[in-house]
């Protein structure tokens, strides 16, 4: 309950950003979620073996990862494979979350981030719009549907500018 309160208190206000290792924070969130998900979902986590520093708010970053993972699990109807892959470029880091779910039609790639858009029977369609707001407005990153194929799955991609520790 405290985590939820912390997250929502940061939305709408200017969150405090910290220079942190995005790999460690992402991995910790994924490991936490893995313990709370059906054994029918297999997780794969791949990342460089060294820290990559980005300016972000840890509670909000964790929430974006959690939302993307939960959406992926919903799309797979609770069973399938979930791959989280972090790659480093010269100035950026990319986080890709790939599922083996139902896929998203190409004409809905941008719509999935609109408030109120949902394909689920439950929910308000706010998760991805809040995720986009956190990634783009607060963390100055980018988020998109990188690839999706109906009946095969989807890859969501976030990218963030790297920073140096001073």
Where is each model-derived feature located?
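Conserved DHp (HisKA) dimerization/phosphotransfer helix of two-component histidine kinases, i.e.
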Residues: 1-40
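Conserved catalytic submotifs in the C-terminal HATPase_c
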Residues: 40-52, 89
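Short beta-strand-loop-beta element adjacent to the nucleotide/active-site pocket used for signaling
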Residues: 82, 87-95
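Acidic ATP/Mg2+-coordinating residue in the GHKL
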Residues: 99
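Short conserved segment of the HATPase_c
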Residues: 104-116
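Short alpha-helical Gxxx[C/S/T] motif in the catalytic ATP-binding
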Residues: 127, 131-132
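Detector for a conserved hydrophobic position within an alpha-helical segment of the HATPase_c
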Residues: 135-136
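Glycine-rich ATP-binding loops of the HATPase_c
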Residues: 139-147
């Amino acid at each position: 309950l405290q985590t939820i309160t912390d997250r929502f208190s940061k939305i709408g206000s200017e969150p405090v950003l910290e220079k942190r290792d995005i790999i460690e924070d992402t991995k910790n969130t994924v490991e936490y979620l893995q313990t709370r998900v059906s054994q029918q979902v297999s997780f794969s986590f791949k990342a460089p073996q060294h820290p990559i520093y980005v300016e972000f708010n840890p509670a909000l970053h964790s929430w974006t990862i959690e939302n993307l993972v939960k959406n992926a699990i919903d799309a797979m109807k609770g069973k399938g494979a979930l791959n989280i892959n972090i790659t480093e470029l010269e100035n950026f880091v990319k986080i890709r979350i790939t599922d083996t779910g139902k896929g998203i039609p190409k004409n809905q790639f941008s719509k999935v981030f609109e408030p109120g858009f949902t394909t689920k029977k439950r929910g308000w369609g706010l998760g991805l719009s809040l995720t986009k707001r956190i990634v783009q407005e607060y963390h100055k990153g980018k988020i998109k549907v990188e690839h999706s194929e109906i009946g095969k799955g989807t890859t969501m991609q976030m990218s963030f500018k790297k920073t140096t520790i001073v």
